[in-house]
Amino acid sequence: MKHKLKTRVQSELELSFLAEVKKYDNVLNATKFISRNQHKIMTTGRGLRATRIFTRQTILGISLDKILPRPTKYTHLDLFNWDVVSLAAFARNILEGYLSFHYFGIEDISDEEAELRFFILQLHRNIEWFEIRKLNNEDNLDDFEKGIPEQKERIKNHPFLSSLSKYQQGLAIKGLEMYKTKQNFEESLLICKDLRRDYRLLSNLVHPLPIAIERIDDEKGRGVGSDADISFSLLCLMVARKYLAATTVGMVDFFQERFSDKKYSASIALIRELMSE
């Protein structure tokens, strides 16, 4: 005689989260499909960086998927680990990845501006390696000590630098990886219209700051599926889904020749609306 499993009534909030999980699954499946078929792309420079960042986004998307709670009417919420901190960390990483994907890869800019961005990227990389090796008490740092000032001068004298605002020029000369601010992204990309709000919330959940710490009590922040944790998990997943979808759509649109076949366009058509929904 078979025993009938007891069921429970799932809350509207839980069902909303599970509906978002389905949307994320659709985006991730399309992302993995495109990722598996990007190997024939022949590109250099910005295109090459775009493919590398896309690969990174794919891996992040898969890793996030592995920690998603997937409760059913037959399972209790506390059987799953509702890890808001890790979900927020993955979501913020995917958000940042999209900004880099756009800025360093697919954004339509002049060759002159692309060259300046490349020079700044090189400077940023060398400054970071110099500081890491210096803190590690390594010898033979002469090339860095000589090269970094020379790179800064090259940026200062670059013909495109004067096209930037004074504030952006300062960021460029310092070697910050991007001279576009979050506000710049909000003003130029519809996908980023809530960028500063989303980034600030995710950052406060990721770091051990008052907003993240003070919310922890006997129910919230313990991973047991409280309404508050489900709500934050839903918000994190919505951000991750939106920016992962934007990355994948951007990849296909940028490399149109490679992904012109109907099997790709059909897959992407399903997730275009998930960039903003």
Whereabouts are the PLM-identified features?
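A cross-kingdom marker of C-terminal helix-rich interaction/assembly modules
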Residues: M1-E277
